[in-house]
Protein backbone atom coordinates (compact mmCIF):
# COMPACT_ATOMS: atom_id res chain seq x y z
CA UNK A 1 0.00 0.00 0.00
CA UNK A 2 1.31 3.43 -0.92
CA UNK A 3 0.81 6.63 1.07
CA UNK A 4 -1.50 7.84 -1.70
CA UNK A 5 -3.74 4.77 -1.52
CA UNK A 6 -3.96 4.66 2.28
CA UNK A 7 -7.20 5.76 3.89
CA UNK A 8 -7.49 8.75 6.21
CA UNK A 9 -8.06 6.32 9.08
CA UNK A 10 -4.93 4.35 8.25
CA UNK A 11 -2.88 7.53 8.03
CA UNK A 12 -4.20 8.70 11.40
CA UNK A 13 -3.26 5.40 13.03
CA UNK A 14 0.24 5.67 11.55
CA UNK A 15 0.72 9.20 12.85
CA UNK A 16 -0.21 8.70 16.47
CA UNK A 17 -1.86 6.52 19.04
CA UNK A 18 -4.41 6.67 20.45
CA UNK A 19 -6.74 8.30 17.97
CA UNK A 20 -10.13 9.62 19.07
CA UNK A 21 -13.47 9.55 17.30
CA UNK A 22 -17.05 10.72 17.39
CA UNK A 23 -20.19 8.74 16.60
CA UNK A 24 -23.04 9.72 14.29
CA UNK A 25 -26.51 8.16 14.49
CA UNK A 26 -28.60 10.41 12.25
CA UNK A 27 -28.54 11.47 8.58
CA UNK A 28 -26.84 14.84 8.94
CA UNK A 29 -23.47 16.20 7.93
CA UNK A 30 -23.36 18.57 10.90
CA UNK A 31 -22.07 15.91 13.29
CA UNK A 32 -19.09 14.87 11.15
CA UNK A 33 -18.21 18.48 10.39
CA UNK A 34 -18.27 19.52 14.03
CA UNK A 35 -16.28 16.50 15.17
CA UNK A 36 -13.68 17.31 12.50
CA UNK A 37 -13.58 20.95 13.54
CA UNK A 38 -13.06 19.90 17.16
CA UNK A 39 -9.98 17.89 16.14
CA UNK A 40 -11.36 14.36 16.23
CA UNK A 41 -9.50 11.79 14.13
CA UNK A 42 -12.41 9.72 12.84
CA UNK A 43 -16.19 9.54 12.75
CA UNK A 44 -18.23 6.37 13.12
CA UNK A 45 -21.59 6.05 11.38
CA UNK A 46 -24.02 3.75 13.16
CA UNK A 47 -26.04 1.56 10.80
CA UNK A 48 -26.84 -0.85 13.62
CA UNK A 49 -28.60 1.30 16.22
CA UNK A 50 -28.64 4.58 14.32
CA UNK A 51 -31.17 5.96 11.83
CA UNK A 52 -28.98 5.61 8.75
CA UNK A 53 -29.71 3.65 5.59
CA UNK A 54 -27.44 2.94 2.61
CA UNK A 55 -28.37 6.15 0.80
CA UNK A 56 -27.78 8.24 3.93
CA UNK A 57 -24.35 6.75 4.46
CA UNK A 58 -23.31 7.07 0.82
CA UNK A 59 -24.42 10.71 0.74
CA UNK A 60 -22.71 11.64 3.99
CA UNK A 61 -19.47 9.91 3.00
CA UNK A 62 -19.40 11.84 -0.25
CA UNK A 63 -20.19 15.15 1.44
CA UNK A 64 -17.50 14.65 4.09
CA UNK A 65 -14.65 13.47 1.87
CA UNK A 66 -13.02 16.92 2.16
CA UNK A 67 -12.83 16.62 5.97
CA UNK A 68 -9.59 15.44 7.63
CA UNK A 69 -11.30 12.58 9.47
CA UNK A 70 -11.39 8.84 8.95
CA UNK A 71 -14.74 7.17 8.39
CA UNK A 72 -16.02 3.97 9.97
CA UNK A 73 -19.43 2.33 9.53
CA UNK A 74 -20.87 -0.03 12.12
CA UNK A 75 -23.03 -2.79 10.67
CA UNK A 76 -25.17 -5.29 12.61
CA UNK A 77 -23.59 -8.49 11.27
CA UNK A 78 -21.20 -10.00 8.72
CA UNK A 79 -23.70 -10.02 5.84
CA UNK A 80 -21.54 -9.52 2.74
CA UNK A 81 -23.82 -7.23 0.74
CA UNK A 82 -24.03 -4.31 3.21
CA UNK A 83 -20.31 -4.53 3.92
CA UNK A 84 -19.53 -4.28 0.22
CA UNK A 85 -21.93 -1.38 -0.27
CA UNK A 86 -20.49 0.86 2.44
CA UNK A 87 -16.93 0.13 1.32
CA UNK A 88 -17.91 0.86 -2.29
CA UNK A 89 -19.32 4.16 -1.03
CA UNK A 90 -15.93 5.08 0.41
CA UNK A 91 -15.90 4.11 4.08
CA UNK A 92 -12.40 3.62 5.43
CA UNK A 93 -13.46 0.68 7.58
CA UNK A 94 -16.37 -1.36 8.86
CA UNK A 95 -17.05 -2.37 12.45
CA UNK A 96 -19.08 -5.58 12.50
CA UNK A 97 -21.23 -5.94 15.60
CA UNK A 98 -21.81 -9.05 17.69
CA UNK A 99 -18.88 -11.09 16.40
CA UNK A 100 -18.71 -14.19 18.61
CA UNK A 101 -16.46 -16.60 16.72
CA UNK A 102 -13.49 -16.81 14.41
CA UNK A 103 -15.79 -18.02 11.63
CA UNK A 104 -17.93 -14.89 11.90
CA UNK A 105 -14.83 -12.68 11.91
CA UNK A 106 -13.48 -14.51 8.86
CA UNK A 107 -16.79 -13.96 7.06
CA UNK A 108 -16.55 -10.23 7.73
CA UNK A 109 -13.01 -10.13 6.33
CA UNK A 110 -14.03 -12.13 3.25
CA UNK A 111 -16.82 -9.65 2.54
CA UNK A 112 -14.25 -6.86 2.34
CA UNK A 113 -11.74 -8.71 0.12
CA UNK A 114 -11.92 -9.55 -3.58
CA UNK A 115 -11.38 -13.09 -4.93
CA UNK A 116 -9.40 -15.20 -4.41
CA UNK A 117 -8.99 -13.94 -0.81
CA UNK A 118 -12.66 -13.12 -0.36
CA UNK A 119 -16.01 -12.74 -2.04
CA UNK A 120 -16.45 -8.99 -2.44
CA UNK A 121 -17.88 -7.92 -5.78
CA UNK A 122 -16.19 -5.01 -7.57
CA UNK A 123 -18.46 -2.00 -7.83
CA UNK A 124 -16.82 1.24 -6.66
CA UNK A 125 -19.22 4.18 -6.44
CA UNK A 126 -16.70 6.91 -5.64
CA UNK A 127 -14.71 8.22 -8.61
CA UNK A 128 -12.18 9.75 -6.22
CA UNK A 129 -11.14 6.25 -5.09
CA UNK A 130 -10.08 5.09 -8.55
CA UNK A 131 -10.63 1.70 -10.13
CA UNK A 132 -7.71 -0.40 -8.86
CA UNK A 133 -9.09 -3.37 -6.89
CA UNK A 134 -5.82 -3.71 -4.98
CA UNK A 135 -6.08 -0.13 -3.73
CA UNK A 136 -9.71 -0.60 -2.76
CA UNK A 137 -8.90 -3.75 -0.84
CA UNK A 138 -5.82 -2.40 0.89
CA UNK A 139 -7.62 0.63 2.30
CA UNK A 140 -10.65 -1.29 3.62
CA UNK A 141 -10.35 -1.94 7.34
CA UNK A 142 -12.36 -4.63 9.13
CA UNK A 143 -12.98 -4.51 12.88
CA UNK A 144 -14.65 -7.29 14.86
CA UNK A 145 -16.86 -5.87 17.60
CA UNK A 146 -16.35 -7.81 20.81
CA UNK A 147 -19.31 -7.44 23.14
CA UNK A 148 -20.44 -10.81 24.48
CA UNK A 149 -19.25 -13.49 26.86
CA UNK A 150 -18.98 -15.89 23.91
CA UNK A 151 -16.65 -13.51 22.08
CA UNK A 152 -14.58 -13.09 25.23
CA UNK A 153 -14.20 -16.86 25.51
CA UNK A 154 -12.99 -17.09 21.91
CA UNK A 155 -10.99 -13.87 21.80
CA UNK A 156 -7.65 -15.47 20.89
CA UNK A 157 -9.18 -17.42 18.00
CA UNK A 158 -10.97 -14.29 16.75
CA UNK A 159 -7.79 -12.22 16.92
CA UNK A 160 -5.94 -14.88 14.91
CA UNK A 161 -8.21 -14.43 11.87
CA UNK A 162 -6.08 -13.48 8.87
CA UNK A 163 -6.88 -10.07 7.41
CA UNK A 164 -8.62 -8.63 10.45
CA UNK A 165 -7.63 -5.01 11.07
CA UNK A 166 -8.62 -4.79 14.69
CA UNK A 167 -11.16 -5.35 17.41
CA UNK A 168 -13.63 -2.83 18.78
CA UNK A 169 -15.04 -3.37 22.26
CA UNK A 170 -18.67 -2.58 23.07
CA UNK A 171 -18.67 -2.20 26.87
CA UNK A 172 -22.45 -1.86 27.31
CA UNK A 173 -23.42 -5.12 25.60
CA UNK A 174 -20.40 -6.82 27.11
CA UNK A 175 -21.58 -5.77 30.57
CA UNK A 176 -25.08 -7.10 29.89
CA UNK A 177 -23.69 -10.39 28.62
CA UNK A 178 -21.56 -10.75 31.75
CA UNK A 179 -24.53 -10.03 34.01
CA UNK A 180 -23.41 -6.54 35.00
CA UNK A 181 -25.05 -3.14 34.73
CA UNK A 182 -24.68 -0.83 31.74
CA UNK A 183 -24.14 2.40 33.70
CA UNK A 184 -20.44 2.82 34.41
CA UNK A 185 -19.73 -0.48 32.68
CA UNK A 186 -16.00 0.10 32.27
CA UNK A 187 -15.62 0.74 36.01
CA UNK A 188 -17.18 -2.55 37.06
CA UNK A 189 -14.46 -5.06 38.02
CA UNK A 190 -15.71 -8.01 35.97
CA UNK A 191 -16.22 -5.89 32.87
CA UNK A 192 -12.92 -4.07 33.27
CA UNK A 193 -11.11 -7.38 33.65
CA UNK A 194 -12.72 -8.58 30.42
CA UNK A 195 -11.78 -5.37 28.61
CA UNK A 196 -8.16 -5.76 29.69
CA UNK A 197 -8.15 -9.39 28.47
CA UNK A 198 -9.52 -8.35 25.09
CA UNK A 199 -7.05 -5.49 24.70
CA UNK A 200 -4.08 -7.70 25.53
CA UNK A 201 -5.16 -10.48 23.19
CA UNK A 202 -5.66 -8.07 20.30
CA UNK A 203 -2.45 -6.20 20.99
CA UNK A 204 -0.47 -9.44 21.17
CA UNK A 205 -1.94 -10.37 17.77
CA UNK A 206 -0.79 -7.07 16.27
CA UNK A 207 -4.30 -5.71 15.81
CA UNK A 208 -5.65 -2.20 16.27
CA UNK A 209 -7.46 -2.05 19.60
CA UNK A 210 -10.62 0.03 19.58
CA UNK A 211 -13.33 0.71 22.15
CA UNK A 212 -16.52 2.71 22.59
CA UNK A 213 -15.80 4.90 25.63
CA UNK A 214 -18.73 7.32 25.65
CA UNK A 215 -17.02 10.24 27.40
CA UNK A 216 -13.63 11.86 27.77
CA UNK A 217 -12.83 10.56 31.25
CA UNK A 218 -13.50 6.99 30.21
CA UNK A 219 -11.58 7.62 27.00
CA UNK A 220 -8.54 8.68 28.99
CA UNK A 221 -8.80 5.56 31.14
CA UNK A 222 -9.03 3.35 28.06
CA UNK A 223 -6.00 5.08 26.53
CA UNK A 224 -4.05 4.27 29.69
CA UNK A 225 -5.01 0.62 29.21
CA UNK A 226 -3.40 0.73 25.78
CA UNK A 227 -6.37 1.14 23.44
CA UNK A 228 -5.39 2.82 20.19
CA UNK A 229 -8.77 3.88 18.75
CA UNK A 230 -11.29 5.37 21.16
CA UNK A 231 -14.77 6.72 20.47
CA UNK A 232 -15.61 9.51 22.91
CA UNK A 233 -19.19 10.57 22.18
CA UNK A 234 -22.10 10.45 19.78
CA UNK A 235 -23.39 13.67 18.26
CA UNK A 236 -26.48 13.54 20.48
CA UNK A 237 -24.34 13.15 23.61
CA UNK A 238 -22.08 16.02 22.59
CA UNK A 239 -25.08 18.25 21.91
CA UNK A 240 -26.77 17.36 25.20
CA UNK A 241 -23.64 17.92 27.28
CA UNK A 242 -22.81 21.17 25.53
CA UNK A 243 -26.37 22.44 25.87
CA UNK A 244 -26.43 21.53 29.57
CA UNK A 245 -23.13 23.34 30.15
CA UNK A 246 -24.41 26.51 28.47
CA UNK A 247 -27.61 26.38 30.54
CA UNK A 248 -25.63 25.99 33.78
CA UNK A 249 -23.46 28.96 32.87
CA UNK A 250 -26.51 31.09 32.13
CA UNK A 251 -28.42 30.20 35.28
CA UNK A 252 -25.72 30.07 37.96
Language-model features: locations:
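Glycine-rich, positively charged N-terminal anion/phosphate-binding segment
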Residues: 3-7, 27-34, 38, 51-65, ...
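Hydrophobic faces of well-ordered beta-strands that scaffold small-molecule active sites
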Residues: 18-24, 43-45, 71-74, 94-96, ...
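Short, acidic/polar
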Residues: 24-38, 77-86, 149-161, 214-220
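Alpha-helix-loop-beta-strand connector modules within alpha/beta enzyme cores
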Residues: 54-88, 112-117, 135-137, 187-210, ...
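Conserved anion-binding
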Residues: 81, 91-179
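C-terminal alpha-helical cap/extension of soluble enzyme domains
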Residues: 120-129, 146-150, 183-252
Amino acid sequence: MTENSASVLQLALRRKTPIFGGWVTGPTVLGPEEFARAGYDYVGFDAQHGYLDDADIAGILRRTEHLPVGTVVRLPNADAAPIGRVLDAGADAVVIAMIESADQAAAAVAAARYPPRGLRSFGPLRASLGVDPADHESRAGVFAMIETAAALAGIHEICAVNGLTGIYVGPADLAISLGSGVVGATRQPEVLEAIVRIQRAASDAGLVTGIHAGDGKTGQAMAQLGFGMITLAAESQALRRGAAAHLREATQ
